[in-house]
């Protein structure tokens, strides 16, 4: 750096620096020569006589004036040449103490004499990470965060957009979309790296609405693989979702069930601002950087929940302890620097995390100018990344996953529920407030498990008309939420309507009128962002929505890793990739089918059937079907293949009827499933089939098969899996559906839901979808883990009713399958669509607050709340569907894991 006051092509300063003295000019020296003190005495005397002449004084005065003027001009033009040449700009003069009519050093601010461009030229480059035309060709200064000097390439300190701004090359966003048929990587990269980049709180709708203001993200969307909605996990909070993305696990499985939580066994509380956040005991499962470490693949994380914690004793190879004050640009540059490390140090997997637009959404709400500014900011940051990758030759090499953890909702102080309004004294309870609130006693851990949560739930149920919250014992929550099997989830939880939140009292919550998240993961405003871009992803593809737990396996495939056990369906995202890496296969059936020949003796069931119903006169003739008849039954009842049983050592036999097929459990003495097809022109009769059963001689007779067994029980009865009221060919179908092999124990309160489902919903589906195939059956999930129960758990939960052991289902499932093409029959679809439900089987309908409501309203609401993935049904029943289909297994997994979102109007 040159000295102060000097510029290229200028002479040195005149006079000793700092003493205020300056050397005489040659002109002044010659004029002062007659006054030299070294003259002889006679000459002095002569001069003295001459000086008495008045004209002499005038001449001397004139000479002295000229000398002074010459000296001043010499100072101006000889000593300060820089002032005349450049006095208006700081370019090339930043922080140098040059003295002119404007200055460019730090003191100019207090003196008030800065050049007009001081801020833009000298100050902004200390914290701005981009070039502009004015900065091009600037002088390099160490205090600038990046350089726009002409030699910045040689010094490797250029701002990321230097090439596009100063060399007039196209930026990444200015280039046209290009199909990347194969990775185009620098020689030092053996395979494409993967970068997982999170924009916290980026609601999916933001891109739908403001995409025109987000050129970089919009280009990634248009050139890569994109889904309009990626489904977060519940609760839709930051830590649970980020950790689910990198583990493939639901919060109940990986342990991070909220941003704030209490563990009764550890007797410790977790929050984002506490030291407990760094305690590895909170983190279960295996995040992808640990998976990578186990398989000798390096990783680098610039922030990610859990990445600064020693999980399983392992940290990423390069990581940063979270610090929200680090500028976004610095994070981008760091990752770009990591990508330039030697191969033996360079990570193969990377994460990046930005707090926006979540922070602005919380402060100002999702529909605000501040959020739009935040979106434009993160779009600019993503653009920096893409330009940086382009400069490194990695823009056609690296696989980028641009993702968010959840959406954002507008809060309102008028849409907050306070429990003290209903409970009065609330000193003995504590509530984790928000849209997914939870309650526990204050005395913990002593009373955590013994507290009477059930009584409190009943007390808070149906207190008001159109109540906006529902108290749930956690095992009654919709199974699709997967939010029960963890002690950190309090036994009493609250489900809130869209836009609503709950707290103990007003003083407990922080704010109410700004943005929030945490609600049901099917609400449209909770949906998240997903874009995949790079050589592995399809070009310009838009895919159906999927859940973020599926991303872990996808990343493992991109990195060549074997995934750790997780909750995902490996291969369900194969349709995002040009060349899928993993090929899934159907699970093998674990229990072979047993025989159920006709061997029972007819007995009196204590039933009274309507005389109009045609009874079964010759059981063997009617149900001992020929091979051709069996094939006809298969094609009509299970056109997509019969469900396979994945439960080990479970005796099941197939029972063929003319109009439906049954998988009957000889261990449970009830059907595991029945399957039939409801065609668009089928009708339901209005006949009464109560108190009418026919004995199925192919199965052992049980007291629970008799009408007399249920006559003295006020709440428990039986229900039919295949509805007897379905009218197709003749009255003979009635007697088939009235067989004892078609009934299950069912609460009378639930029969209302079950009948509406068959009489109304199935009929509507059949008419709208040109027919529908139906598979339904009981569910047993007493340990509420979303998996089918073992025989030991079933035995522990068997109830004795009227001296008879009875196993009452916890839920009932129903899977509806139709054709994607409405012109096709469900008996022969080229492509499928499916819907599924897991309905809680309870002795009352308190969940729905039925008083004063139309049956159609509350049942439809209940069905919507308890919809599920087909995969959820498979996990909880031990069944596997669609195994006879011709589609690839990955395509079937795509179908099974799909779940439509709720619009805000639903």
Swiss-Prot record:
UniProt: CMP binding residues: 238, 259, 277, 322, 358, 406, 517
Motif Di-leucine motif: positions: 27-34
Region annotated Disordered, chain positions: 1-25
Stored InterPro entries: Alkaline_phosphatase_core_sf, DNA/RNA_non-sp_Endonuclease_sf, Endo_G_ENPP1-like_dom, ENPP1-3/EXOG-like_nuc-like, His-Me_finger_sf, Phosphodiest/P_Trfase, SMB_chordata, Somatomedin_B-like_dom_sf
Documented activity regulation: At low concentrations of ATP, a phosphorylated intermediate is formed which inhibits further hydrolysis.
Designated name of the protein: Ectonucleotide pyrophosphatase/phosphodiesterase family member 1
Domain notes: The di-leucine motif is required for basolateral targeting in polarized epithelial cells, and for targeting to matrix vesicles derived from mineralizing cells. The nuclease-like domain is most probably catalytically inactive as residues that are essential for catalysis in the DNA/RNA non-specific endonucleases are not conserved. However, it is required for the stability of the protein and the catalytic activity born by the phosphodiesterase domain.
PANTHER family membership: ECTONUCLEOTIDE PYROPHOSPHATASE/PHOSPHODIESTERASE (PTHR10151), ECTONUCLEOTIDE PYROPHOSPHATASE_PHOSPHODIESTERASE FAMILY MEMBER 1 (PTHR10151:SF77)
């Amino acid at each position: 750096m040159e000295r102060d006051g000097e510029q290229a092509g200028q002479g040195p300063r005149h006079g000793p620096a700092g003493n205020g003295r300056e050397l005489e000019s040659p002109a002044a020296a010659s004029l002062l020569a007659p006054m030299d003190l070294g003259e002889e005495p006679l000459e002095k005397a002569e001069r003295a006589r001459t000086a008495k002449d008045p004209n002499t004084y005038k001449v001397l005065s004139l000479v002295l004036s000229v000398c002074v003027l010459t000296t001043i001009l010499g100072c101006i033009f000889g000593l300060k040449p820089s002032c005349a040449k450049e006095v208006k700009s700081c370019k090339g003069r930043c922080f140098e103490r040059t003295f002119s009519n404007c200055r460019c050093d730090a003191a100019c601010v207090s003196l008030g004499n800065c050049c007009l461009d001081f801020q833009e030229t000298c100050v902004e480059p200390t914290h701005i990470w981009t070039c502009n035309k004015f900065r091009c060709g600037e002088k390099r200064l160490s205090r600038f965060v990046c350089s726009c000097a002409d030699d910045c390439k040689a010094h490797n300190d250029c701002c990321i957009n230097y090439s596009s701004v100063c060399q007039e090359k196209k930026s990444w966003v200015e280039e046209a979309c290009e199909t990347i048929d194969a990775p185009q990587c620098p020689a030092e990269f053996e395979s494409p790296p993967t970068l997982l980049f999170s924009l916290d709180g980026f609601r999916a709708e933001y891109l739908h609405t403001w995409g025109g203001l987000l050129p970089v993200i919009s280009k990634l969307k248009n050139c890569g693989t994109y889904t309009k909605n990626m489904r977060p996990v519940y609760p839709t909070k930051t830590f649970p979702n980020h950790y689910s993305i990198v583990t493939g696990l639901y919060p109940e499985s990986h342990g991070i069930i909220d941003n704030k939580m209490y563990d009764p066994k550890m007797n410790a509380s977790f929050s984002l601002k506490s030291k407990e956040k760094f305690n590895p005991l909170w983190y279960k499962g295996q995040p992808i950087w640990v998976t990578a470490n186990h398989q000798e693949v390096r990783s680098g994380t610039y922030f990610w929940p859990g990445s600064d914690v020693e999980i399983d004793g392992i940290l990423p190879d390069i990581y940063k302890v979270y610090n929200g004050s680090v500028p976004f640009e610095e994070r981008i540059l760091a990752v770009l620097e990591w990508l330039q490390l030697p191969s033996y140090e360079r990570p193969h997997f990377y994460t990046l995390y930005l707090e926006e637009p979540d922070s602005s959404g919380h402060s100002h709400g999702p529909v605000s100018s501040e959020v739009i500014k935040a979106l434009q900011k993160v779009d600019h940051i993503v653009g920096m990344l893409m330009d940086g990758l382009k400069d490194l030759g990695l823009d056609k090499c690296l696989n980028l996953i641009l993702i968010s953890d959840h959406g954002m909702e507008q809060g309102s102080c008028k849409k907050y529920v306070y429990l003290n309004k209903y409970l009065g004294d609330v000193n003995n309870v504590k509530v984790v407030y928000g849209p997914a609130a939870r309650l526990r006693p204050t005395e913990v851990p002593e009373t955590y498990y013994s507290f009477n949560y059930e009584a409190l739930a009943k007390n808070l149920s149906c207190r008001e008309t159109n109540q906006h919250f529902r108290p749930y014992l956690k095992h009654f929550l919709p199974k699709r939420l997967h939010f029960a099997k963890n002690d950190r989830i309090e036994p009493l939880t609250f489900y809130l309507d869209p836009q609503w939140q709950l707290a103990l009292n007003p003083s407990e919550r922080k704010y109410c009128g700004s943005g929030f998240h945490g609600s049901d993961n099917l609400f449209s405003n909770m949906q998240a962002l997903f874009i995949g871009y790079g050589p592995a992803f399809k070009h310009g593809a838009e895919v159906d929505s999927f859940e973020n737990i599926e991303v872990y396996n996808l990343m493992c495939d991109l990195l060549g890793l074997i995934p750790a056990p997780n909750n995902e369906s490996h291969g369900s995202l194969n349709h995002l990739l040009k060349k899928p890496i993993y090929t899934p296969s159907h699970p093998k059936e674990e229990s072979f089918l047993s025989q159920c020949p006709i061997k029972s003796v007819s007995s009196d069931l204590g039933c009274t059937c309507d005389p109009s119903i045609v009874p079964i006169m010759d059981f063997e003739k009617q149900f001992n079907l020929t091979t051709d008849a069996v094939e006809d039954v298969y094609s009509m009842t299970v056109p997509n293949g019969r469900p396979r049983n994945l439960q080990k050592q479970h005796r099941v036999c197939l029972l063929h009827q003319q109009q439906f097929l049954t998988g009957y459990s000889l261990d449970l003495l009830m059907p595991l499933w029945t399957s039939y097809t409801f065609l668009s022109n089928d009708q339901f009769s209005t006949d009464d089939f109560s108190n009418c059963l026919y004995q199925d001689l192919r199965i052992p007779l049980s007291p629970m098969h008799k009408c007399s067994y249920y006559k003295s029980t006020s709440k428990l009865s039986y229900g039919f899996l295949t509805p007897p009221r379905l009218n197709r060919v003749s009255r003979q179908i009635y007697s088939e559906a009235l067989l004892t092999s078609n009934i299950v124990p069912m609460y009378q309160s639930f029969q209302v839901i079950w009948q509406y489902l068959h009489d109304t919903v199935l009929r509507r589906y059949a008419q709208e979808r040109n027919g529908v195939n139906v598979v339904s059956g009981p569910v047993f999930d007493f340990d509420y883990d979303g998996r089918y129960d073992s025989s030991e758990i079933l035995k522990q939960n068997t109830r004795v009713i009227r001296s008879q052991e009875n196993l009452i289902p916890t839920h009932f499932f129903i899977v509806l399958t139709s054709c994607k093409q409405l012109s096709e029959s469900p008996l022969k679809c080229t492509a499928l669509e499916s819907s599924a439900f897991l309905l809680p089987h309870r002795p009352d309908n308190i969940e729905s607050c039925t008083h004063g409501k139309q049956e159609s309203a509350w049942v439809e609401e209940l069905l919507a709340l308890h919809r599920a993935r087909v995969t959820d049904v498979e996990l909880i029943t031990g069944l596997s569907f669609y195994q006879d289909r011709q589609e690839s297994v990955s395509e079937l997994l795509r179908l099974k894991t799909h779940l439509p979102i709720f619009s805000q109007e639903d």
